[in-house]
Regions:
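Short, small-residue-biased leader/transition segments that mark boundaries at the very start
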Residues: 1-3
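Short acidic-hydrophobic, aromatic-tinged amphipathic segments that line or gate anion-handling sites
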Residues: 6-10
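Non-catalytic C-terminal accessory region of glycerolipid acyltransferases
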Residues: 12-139
């Protein structure tokens, strides 16, 4: 079995490269549990408001690509993958409202997947407003 992969770095051409990969029927993996690109949507994630990237929902709505929540867990004898059902891309309102609603659904799916093995989820930066407040209080 041959698996080919390619990293598309964040930058001015990233969007068009990802859209090209989608049109070529490639599988795209996007980091969705933190906002690294600055295009974000406010959602509730583990009971607190935070910002998550709008990219996955935006790309899926614009291209019709299937949006699947996926997690890979380390097990004693290797890795185990879980693929959740596709997230509905049904249009219910204005584009931005649909992006927000779908991004909230992504957050809920990530909560489900993270709860399966929370010790395997790692954040290397503050993710919630309360994280930044607690960092400021440390000496």
């Amino acid at each position: 079995m041959c698996i080919r992969d390619r990293v598309i770095p964040v930058g001015p051409d990233a969007g068009s490269q990802v859209i090209k990969a989608i049109s070529d029927k490639r599988v795209i993996v996007l980091v969705s549990d933190r906002d690294i690109g600055g295009s974000s949507v406010e959602v509730e994630f583990f009971g607190e408001k935070t910002l998550l990237p709008a990219g996955p929902a935006t790309l899926a709505l614009r291209t019709g690509a299937t949006l699947l929540p996926v997690a890979i867990y380390n097990k004693g004898d290797g890795c185990h993958g879980v693929v959740r059902p596709a997230i509905s891309l049904e249009r219910k309102g204005k584009f931005r409202s649909d992006v927000k609603r779908i991004t909230q659904t992504i957050a809920e799916e990530m909560e489900f997947l993270i709860r399966k093995a929370p010790e395997q989820w790692h954040l290397m930066q503050p993710n919630w407003p309360s994280d930044s407040k607690s960092e400021k209080g440390r000496v």
